[in-house]
Amino acid sequence: MKNITDSFLCLGSWPSAGSFVFNTDILATNPINLSVVLGVLVFFGKGVLSDLLDNRKQKIWRTIQNSEELQEEAIEQLEKAQARLRKVETEADRFRVNGYSEIKREKLNLIHSIYTTLEQLENYKNEAIDFEQQRVINQVRQRVLQQALQGALGTLNSCLNNELHLRTVSANIGMFGTMKEKNN
């Protein structure tokens, strides 16, 4: 501590301006040099430091403002996305409900169509059976009639002889002749 006070006392006892002396006491000169350098730095560096701090403050302020703007935009986009999501979910629910009702309606239509087709097939089957029965009945009638005619023809052929045949033909010719005379 004595050295520091000695160095300040030395300042008062410096030689006049005409002479220049080097102070070789390093411990005494360093605090003086440091105080001078710090004084010069504070005096001249105050403006630079102030400008640097102002610039840094402005950059930080702009960064904060940009961050707030980005945050607001992100919030808006999030709200829009949530609104779109709600809309899509609503549409999906509507499509799901409509889809289920459409499936039920199609199912009922298909069941109705199947029942209608089954009824038509049943009607076609019954018509085919009726038609086949009529055809079989007609065939049976034709055969019975054919057999009856063959039996009657056979009976007539066995009962008719030539004389009876000639008499029948003559009687029929006579009937035709009388009918002809009446018409004239």
Curated annotation (Swiss-Prot):
Q: In which domain of life is the source organism classified?
A: Eukaryota
Keywords, ordered alphabetically:
ATP synthesis, CF(0), Chloroplast, Hydrogen ion transport, Ion transport, Membrane, Plastid, Thylakoid, Transmembrane, Transmembrane helix, Transport
GO cellular component terms given for this protein: chloroplast thylakoid membrane; proton-transporting ATP synthase complex
Predominant subcellular localization, coarse grouping: plastid
Mind telling me which PANTHER family this protein's record contains?
ATP SYNTHASE SUBUNIT B, CHLOROPLASTIC (PTHR34264:SF3)
Q: What else is known?
A: In plastids the F-type ATPase is also known as CF(1)CF(0).
Quaternary organization = F-type ATPases have 2 components, F(1) - the catalytic core - and F(0) - the membrane proton channel. F(1) has five subunits: alpha(3), beta(3), gamma(1), delta(1), epsilon(1). F(0) has four main subunits: a(1), b(1), b'(1) and c(10-14). The alpha and beta chains form an alternating ring which encloses part of the gamma chain. F(1) is attached to F(0) by a central stalk formed by the gamma and epsilon chains, while a peripheral stalk is formed by the delta, b and b' chains.
This protein is called ATP synthase subunit b, chloroplastic
Lineage here is: Eukaryota, Viridiplantae, Streptophyta, Embryophyta, Tracheophyta
